From Swiss-Prot:
UniProt key word Magnesium: no
GO biological process annotation, one example: regulation of cell shape
PANTHER family linked to this entry: GLUCONEOGENESIS FACTOR-RELATED, UNCHARACTERIZED PROTEIN YVCK-RELATED
Pfam families cross-referenced by the UniProt entry: CofD
Keyword field: Cytoplasm
Single GO cellular component term: cytoplasm
Protein name: Putative gluconeogenesis factor
Free-text function comment from the UniProt entry: Required for morphogenesis under gluconeogenic growth conditions.
Compartments, record wording: Cytoplasm
Chief location bin: cytoplasm
Family assignment from sequence similarity: Belongs to the gluconeogenesis factor family.
Amino acid sequence: MRNRTLADLERVVALGGGHGLGRVMSSLSSLGSRLTGIVTTTDNGGSTGRIRRSEGGIAWGDTRNCLNQLITEPSVASAMFEYRFTGNGELAGHNLGNLMLKALDHLSIRPIEAINLVRSLLKVDALLIPMSEQPVDLMAIDHEGHPIYGEVNIDQLAQMPQEMLLSPPVHATREAVEAINQADVILIGPGSFLTSLMPLLLLDELTQALRRSSASMIYIGNLGRELSPAAAALSLQDKLTIMESKIGRKIIDAVIVSPTIDISGVKDRIIVQQPLEAKDIPHRHDRELLRQALENTLQQLNGADSV
């Protein structure tokens, strides 16, 4: 890849979950259908968790969040999709978008078809692919050897777990593997390290695709301290080491982090360290600043390729 900008890229793939993936995708929404998000589907908290306990299926919350952030044309449909019930009734706290996705899942052959129907309804061009279309939860073995089930409990761990795994073992969505295979650039993060990023790296098909990929890979760091005590204790280099040990080789070419992040120990990678925080929401990436940082990173990768 030489002297190319974001606008020149044929395929950009972003991996993650929560608010982080939506923020990245909305900053790159001008890429349209050339942008693909691979979304974590292990959430078991909030409205999503209640739906899963009642109806089963994959976690829809992170996908809904991404779709919300990709809406560029406000409409009755988008207002409905973003609506959250209030009050004290059984629907209180539920997001209508989650319920719509679950209903469409019942009507569709595959969850990805439900997502595509909503994308069409909301006029979202970017592609969204669940990491797996099979119901799955995150599980960890804590430092004392005890099994810990579910994202909510894992986020409360005081120390890093000995092991993380998916329960039950599931397959990656085939379109997710194909997207990685075709990508020019792959973005990882931002997001909760243990519960938004690591689940993706527990899928063998995805890690194999990442290991084979010749795409430039960029890790985007969080802006604020992680709520998870275990993840908050990790340095930037710790996170890179853990991710690459799961993937099986050193693949991350560049990192984008804020000026407050300690980059000590990070070697042999391009480091782009510049202001990224939005003024209106603490610890959230400003879309334009993030896009500028990505452009800056691409230019440095271009320079490294030409050496």
